[in-house]
Design a protein with these regions (language model features):
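Short, flexible coil/linker elements and helix-boundary hinge sites characteristic
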Residues: 14, 97, 113, 144-145, ...
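Amphipathic alpha-helical "stem/stalk" segments
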Residues: 22-139
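Transmembrane signal-anchor/signal-peptide helices with a preference for the extracytoplasmic
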Residues: 2-27, 31
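Terminal, low-structured helical/coil segments at or just beyond the last alpha-helical repeat
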Residues: 128-174
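Intrinsically disordered, low-complexity segments used for protein-protein interactions
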Residues: 1-2, 173
Length: 174
């Protein structure tokens, strides 16, 4: 009888041991999955942060490039192309939150470009290079936090209303 009891105890112990090992493996796998999931979330968050920084840097570089190109076109008297470059620069300055250069470009648009162009020339920019002043105004309205851009938006709209409709009207006006 003591052998039977000993055998039974060993068998029970072995079963308990196997069951405990299985439970430990299950728990370890669960903890591994939780750690992997948590690490994936953190890595994904960091990747998104870096992607956003890269996108901001790209937007900043593009904005400055188009800003300079607009200045060159303005100096050469190609105001229609300068306006297109300034519109593109303004969109990129909005993306990278460079409000100082955005104000500069918007002032160039209102002071140097729109007064010298007809609405026909301004609308032709959509076809020429995809620069749409109306989309820029919409985007400025969306990003107009605390009313910082209200006066320049108003000024652009007023200048557009005063602009001659066609190239012929512009020539007659001068």
């Amino acid at each position: 009888i003591p052998f039977v009891i000993q055998w039974y105890q060993n068998k029970t112990l072995k079963l308990s041991e196997d069951l405990l090992k299985k439970e430990i493996k299950i728990e370890i796998n669960k903890i591994k999955e939780d750690i992997i999931q948590e690490l994936n979330i953190k890595v994904e968050k960091k990747i998104n942060e870096y992607e956003n920084k890269i996108n901001e840097l790209n937007a900043s570089m593009n904005a400055k490039t188009f800003h300079l190109q607009g200045n060159l076109n303005k100096e050469k008297g190609y105001l229609q192309f300068a306006l297109g470059d300034y519109i593109t620069a303004a969109f990129d300055y909005l993306l990278c939150d460079d409000h100082q250069n955005l104000q500069t470009v918007l002032n160039l648009i209102t002071q140097n470009c729109i007064p010298e162009l007809s609405l026909e020339e301004i609308d032709d920019l959509i076809t020429i290079n995809g620069s749409d002043i109306n989309l820029l105004i919409e985007e400025l309205d969306k990003k107009n936090n605390n009313g910082v851009l209200t006066s320049i938006i108003r000024e652009i709209k007023i200048k557009l209303q005063k602009a001659p409709k066609t190239i012929k009207d512009k020539i007659e006006k001068k």
